[in-house]
Amino acid sequence: IIGTALAIAMIMVIVITLRATIAPFAPETHRDRMLIFRFAGLQSKSNVNWQSNGPIGYNTAKACFKAMTIPEAVSITNIWQETMLAAKPAGEMESCSVLQTDDAFWKIFEFEFLSGKPYDNADFDAGAAKAVISEDMARRLFGTSEVVGKTFLLNHSAYIVCGVVRPVSKLAKYAYAQVWIPLSSTSAFTATWGDDNIMGMTAVYILAKSKDDFPAIRQEADRLRAIFMAGHPNFDLLYRGQPDTYFVAAQRYSANNPPAVKEAVRQYILTLLVLLIVPAVNLSGLTLSRMRKRISEIGVRKAFGAPRRELMMQVLSENMLYSLFGGILGLVLSYVAAFLLGGMLFSVDFVSNGGEDLRTMCVDLLFDPTVFLLAFLACFLLNLLSAAIPAWRVTRTNIVDAINER
């Protein structure tokens, strides 16, 4: 039972971790239709040894991606969330995570608005000092979630709350924040670096109408890049295979290194195989040992005419019960592990948001009966095979040898 439980628990933890990387959940509901562009390389045409790597500027992103016609929506945001200080009405300061976005951000990511609405295109073009805040941040700042129309200070700049959304899990790493403000209301809107002001601090998120449009979207992105770079004849802008699908983007850890996609897939497959095969071998040995202790009982039953098939079915039915109890225990253990080891498993810090972030994570990712049933089925089949082989060997033992435990 313990062997089955540990196998199922470990498999579920691995699958939950993988699901957090690729499976859609609010507000990143459309992960399967998303393409992501976060880093580029700027290569000098006159000096092959000169190259800059990193995010691109807003104007570059706008010229190379906003003009696209094939996608459903294109959003430009600050590439990373920033930690800022929000001032309560009484003057106390509260640290919060802030993401600067455009208005199309709210079309790509599906937030649950509890009150108010997001800032729109007119607000973005005007650089309006409006903010969408999470429910938990609203309570921390104002003591209530009914805060639409109220003003607070964000890094000493006044912002008006235009909407309140349900808290977001940090596992939604591209949509997560506690406060969302227009990119055009901050200096990040015009921030650039490098030659010709091509590089900056923005990321691009593209929502395709269908996954089948991905090749056409990449071709259109290359065409727009060529048009933009015609005005910068001294440089090449390197996309390095981007925009990426969500899974590939999760494996891209730096601007100038390719994502290790094959290695990641190979690692997941190898881990799952080890988690399945090792317990199966152990269970086979345990079953054979248990059967040898009952060999005299089997010999007596065979002497009284018990058919081999009946003895086999008894052993297999007992193993089914072990698998069932082990599966239930494994399910419980996997949830306990996800709660206790969440920060390590998902590479996020749950301390700042406490149980609220764990709750939003668990509702969307942990309690999925399909994942459990698949893991349980895999372990059950292996347990069945691991029990069938020793049972077949023992039931073929000669009656006299079985009674004499030989």
Predicted features and spans:
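Membrane-helix entry/capping segments
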Residues: I227-T271, K293, L341-F372
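Structured, solvent-exposed hinge/loop segments at the ends of secondary-structure elements
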Residues: V15-S145, L153-Y159, G343, S347-D357
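A hydrophobic alpha-helix feature that marks transmembrane segments and, especially
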Residues: T271-I298, L311, L385, P390
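Short, strongly hydrophobic transmembrane alpha-helices
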Residues: I1-A23, G327
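Mid-to-C-terminal secondary-structure elements
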Residues: D102-P118, A129-P258
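Hydrophobic alpha-helical interface/terminus motif in multipass membrane transporters
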Residues: T17-T21, L286, M291, I298-V300, ...
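C-terminal membrane-exit region of the final transmembrane helix in multipass inner-membrane proteins
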Residues: P24, D368-R406
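Transmembrane alpha-helical interface segments in multi-pass membrane proteins
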Residues: I2-G3, A7, S296-G342, L374, ...
